[in-house]
Every structure is written in C-alpha cells, then in structure tokens.
C-alpha cells in the first residue's frame, strides 16, 4: 500500500479528473441558458446565444422528430385518470439524476481527501515533538539493525557447525567402508 502522501496525490488526481468529466458532461449535455439577468447581448450571455455545436443540433432535431410521437401518446395518457400529474421530460430527469450522481462522487472524493489530510502527521505537533519521534524511531531502527546483524552471525555459526557435522558424518561413513 502506498504512503499517505501518494494516496493524497492519487485522490487529488482523481478529483481533478472527476471535475473535468463533470464539466465536460454539463458542457455537452445541458441546454444553453443565460448566465445572468443582464441584457441578452451582454458578453456574459453571448455563449447562450451562440450557434449550437453540431452534436447538439442533431439532438434537437431528434427531439423535434420525437415530439409528434409524444403528442400522439399524450392524448392516450390523458384519457387515463392515473396520469393526471405532469411529469418533466425524461431527458431533464435523466440529466438531473446524472448531475446528482456526479455531485455525490465529487463530495465523496473530497471527504476522502479531507480524511487523508487529517491523517498526515504534523498537524497539532510541534517541531520538537516531531524531532523526538524521529529520534525514537531512529534508535529503534538501530536496535533492530544490531539484532539483525547478531542473528546473521548466529546463522553463520550454525551453518559452520552444520557443515562440520556433515563432514564428520561423511568421514565416518568413508572410514567404515574402507
């Protein structure tokens, strides 16, 4: 598992990617609208009045083609007493659902980043306490390294003892055969 700083960097990269994907989705899927209450010809609202990209023009043409079909279906639904409530178009509901899901993903990722930041050392710890902790860890590491060197020496001694015992057994076997 990666250390906390690497995890934090990965989460930040993922958050940036999610922001980018969300903005791209809104940019390509949302209906153009005025940004503020200024005049329609103001600079801030010119984007809403700009010609539509080809993909959005195709979508609007498809909608217009589907409208006559929906008008045929609506009288049938109006005769049904259960369908008295007016529901928003399916595309609007779908767009809103996707936006809610994307927002939830962004919120969860930002909470994950906050938890990683909170788990980082140094917050609420003075530099002296950090140095003391580093010194303690360094002392523990030196003790473990000395123990490791001692165990290596012990292993080498045991190997030498085993080798000498094997030589004695081999010599004993050869002497009995001669």
Curated annotation (Swiss-Prot):
Species of origin reads Candida albicans (strain SC5314 / ATCC MYA-2876)
Q: What is the lineage of its organism?
A: Eukaryota, Fungi, Dikarya, Ascomycota, Saccharomycotina
Offer one example of a GO biological process linked to this entry: regulation of transcription by RNA polymerase II
Q: InterPro entries, alphabetically? A: Med7/Med21-like, Mediator_Med21
The alphabetical list of record keywords is: Activator, Coiled coil, Nucleus, Transcription, Transcription regulation
- Localization: Nucleus
Q: Where is this region: Disordered?
A: 36-91
Q: How does it assemble?
A: Component of the Mediator complex.
Q: What superkingdom heads the lineage?
A: Eukaryota
SUPFAM superfamilies, sorted: Mediator hinge subcomplex-like
Instruction: Give a Gene Ontology cellular component term annotated to this protein.
Output: mediator complex
Stored Pfam families: Med21 (PF11221)
Q: Which residues form a coiled coil?
A: 128-169
Segments of skewed composition (Low complexity): 67-85
Family the UniProt entry places it in: Belongs to the Mediator complex subunit 21 family.
Q: What is this protein called?
A: Mediator of RNA polymerase II transcription subunit 21
């Amino acid at each position: 598992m990666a250390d906390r700083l690497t995890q934090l960097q990965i989460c930040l990269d993922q958050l940036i990617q999610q922001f980018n994907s969300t903005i791209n989705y809104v940019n390509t899927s949302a209906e153009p609208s005025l940004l503020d209450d200024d005049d329609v010809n103001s600079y801030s609202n010119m984007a809403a009045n700009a010609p539509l990209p080809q993909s959005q023009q195709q979508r609007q043409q498809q909608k217009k083609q589907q409208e006559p079909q929906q008008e045929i279906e609506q009288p049938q639904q109006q005769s049904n007493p259960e369908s008295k409530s007016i529901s928003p178009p399916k595309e609007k509901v779908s767009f809103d659902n996707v936006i809610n899901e994307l927002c939830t993903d962004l919120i969860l990722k930002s909470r994950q980043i906050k938890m990683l930041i909170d788990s980082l050392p140094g917050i609420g710890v003075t530099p002296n306490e950090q140095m003391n902790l580093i010194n303690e860890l360094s002392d523990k590491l030196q003790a473990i390294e000395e123990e490791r060197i001692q165990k290596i020496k012990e292993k080498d001694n045991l190997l030498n003892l085993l080798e000498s015992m094997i030589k004695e057994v081999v010599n004993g076997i050869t002497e009995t055969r001669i």
